[in-house]
Amino acid sequence: MGFGSDLKNSHEAVLKLQDWELRLLETVKKFMALRIKSDKEYASTLQNLCNQVDKESTVQMNYVSNVSKSWLLMIQQTEQLSRIMKTHAEDLNSGPLHRLTMMIKDKQQVKKSFIGVHQQIEAEMIKVTKTELEKLKSSYRQLIKEMNSAKEKYKEALAKGKETEKAKERYDKATMKLHVLHNQYVLALKGAQLHQNQYYDTTLPLLLDSLQKMQEEMIKALKGIFDEYSQITSLVTEEIVNVHKEIQMSVEQIDPSTEYNNFIDVHRTTAAKEQEIEFDTSLLEENENLQANEIMWNNLTAESLQVMLKTLAEELIQTQQMLVNKEEAVLELEKRIEESSKTCEKKSDIVLLLSQKQTLEELKQSVQQLRCTEAKFTAQKELLEQKVQENEGKEPPPVVNYEEDARSVTSMERKERLSKFESIRHSIAGIIRSPKSALGSSTFSDTIPISEKPLAEQDWYHGAIPRIEAQDLLKQQGDFLVRESHGKPGEYVLSVYSDGQRRHFIIQFVDNLYRFEGTGFSNIPQLIDHHYTTKQVITKKSGVVLLNPIPKDKKWVLNHEDVTLGELLGKGNFGEVYKGILKDKTAVAVKTCKEDLPQELKIKFLQEAKILKQYDHPNIVKLIGVCTQRQPIYIIMELVPGGDFLSFLRKKKDEIKLKQLVKFSLDAASGMSYLESKNCIHRDLAARNCLVGENNVLKISDFGMSRQEDGGVYSSSGLKQIPIKWTAPEALNYGRYSSESDVWSFGILLWETFSLGVCPYPGMTNQQATEQVERGYRISAPQHCPEDIFKIMMKCWDYKPENRPKFSELQKELTVIKKKVTQ
């Protein structure tokens, strides 16, 4: 099998093969050039990344950190990888690409040479086998005619007996020419036969075999180029593998359990001798009736001691109950973390558990605080019980001898003194009954003192709510709340209403203490509790005093730990949307807000939750709650299993019956009629913003652009993204949104529904669609759309807003149409 034996008559195919191979080589050359450029850019990008790394992050502290060492080695090895990639790109350029360029030139020359030789031998073969023979045959026929003519004339001459010799001579001469030409023709024919045989048996096969040999040599060369390319560009070469091995080894050297051993050794301090807390005996120097470390039981304190003992007993029971609850919560959370750990597919998935682990540690701290409180109450109770039991059944001794002596006072003085002692006694009893009266508590102490509860558990802490929403909650003098800053996550702000203004104070964190401008505290609850109970001004300049803590709306507030994120469902305007599971195993949809979004977008994100809090309707997606205690903010919605309506229409277009399409339309009208009754303007009604729930119930969703206006009209100065083809003319031209503009969008939604998910105004750009609508054009009815439905669409698209129907009217019309449809 070969070119010479099998491709003698396949010249066109051979030429096409060469052309195709040349195009292929040019493509390979272009690809290699782009690969070189890409690798150089990649190497440069890696180097720039390493150069831009904050040098402070690689500077060692005065202790040995494996994390820092590992990070430094990662940077160094990344730089090494950059150098390797740059070298590879240069080798690729000087090696395979250069040789490929030479090979293309050689292949072009081979093609040119083959075509030239083939044309030459083919022309020679045609000349010998056709052209020359045709000439001889033509001359042959002519000489036969001349000989026959001479023969006839010779016969005539014989018959007449005139010029016989002359006629004979001409006859002989013509016969000789014919015979000579005949011999030439026979020889030429023999030569042509041999030439043709040589052409097909030797000459042409030799040329084709020569071409095949060069083709195969070039394939061999190309194979070598490919092999060199493969070796140079391989990402599993020893040097690259070593880079990643070094990185992996440095990562494996990180041991969380020993990471801080050296730090502890360097900064270890000797345990300071604890200060002895003893009774200050100097207090007794001017009084002989009181004894150090002794409970005084007498006629002035007996009653109050009983009250104190009872209060302590109650507080101890409450503390112990709270301790049990917290310990159970610790066990439950530990179990949840353990279960979640088993489902982690990647090592980095442990990050998803960090917030829960932090909550666990906070719970353990709460447990320890409760145990401390329990021990304190127990010791105090035992001290009181001992004193009360010692004197059980005895008459309390008097503190003062009221008998008159030589310097007795008058009866009036005695009454006044008795009155004063009674006042003192009742005052002492009152103080003991309500030792935390300054904090507004009627018990001896809270189970956990308010200031010791975590920030997230404080009623006045609202999490990462927007500034404008915080201001709406502050209405009276002294109203206050604490929130996390939207612009700077991790920074906390005190918002207060004072002297007709809403003031915002950043809570400073300096030297591990929280403060405004006065005393610092170890946590924010202690700081706020101090200013609230003492009525100390926040700053001297502002004169602001905290009077009324504004509690958060606990109905909607959830903690981040209350929901476990699952699979990614998609991406919204503000961040990712996940499937989530609540503690009670309820499946939900979790909308997240990117932490790096501008302040105004975060406000828009929470706007949806603020609106949905007020609504409860089967055709409106339901709000479960919000997680604003820390970043990132979550909005928890009901999980609607069917997904968005637009995708549903396109996916199920061959299955959906007409009656179901009308039902979807009726659901949408019902939901929008409810919103209309609440003066809510959706502003972005479209199939993509509706969801399909169980039993194919359609729900209106995506209230990110919605507004609730008492007048039913909202004017916008401009939106960054406007759904042009869905928006009413008055909204596009003047920024005037209303329920009537939502009705226009509803007409487009109907068109999407009955076209089974086709984009409105097909074939038109946004600008073309807008211009056509202004000229009076309206989209034609979708195929198989009922006439009654299209009439509704046309009503919705009336240019004048006041002429469009109300959603309540649309709901009634669609109800009637639904009853008529049977299929």
UniProtKB/Swiss-Prot annotation:
GO terms for biological process: cell adhesion; chemotaxis; Fc-epsilon receptor signaling pathway. The active site is at D684. It comes from the Eukaryota. It is found in: Cytoplasm; Cytoplasm, Cytoskeleton; Cell membrane; Cell projection. ATP binds at L569, G570, K571, G572, N573, F574, G575, E576, V577, K591. Residues 1-300 are annotated as: Important for interaction with membranes containing phosphoinositides. Belongs to the protein kinase superfamily. Tyr protein kinase family. Fes/fps subfamily. GO terms for molecular function: ATP binding; lipid binding; non-membrane spanning protein tyrosine kinase activity; protein tyrosine kinase activity. The gene is FER. Homotrimer. Interacts with CTNND1, EGFR, FLT3, IRS1, PECAM1, PIK3R1 and PDGFR. Interacts (via SH2 domain) with CTTN. Component of a complex that contains at least FER, CTTN and PTK2/FAK1. This is Tyrosine-protein kinase Fer. Residues 460-550 form the SH2 domain. It comes from Canis lupus familiaris (Dog). Its EC number is 2.7.10.2. The coiled coil domains mediate homooligomerization and are required for location at microtubules. The N-terminal region including the first coiled coil domain mediates interaction with phosphoinositide-containing membranes. PANTHER family: TYROSINE-PROTEIN KINASE (PTHR24418).
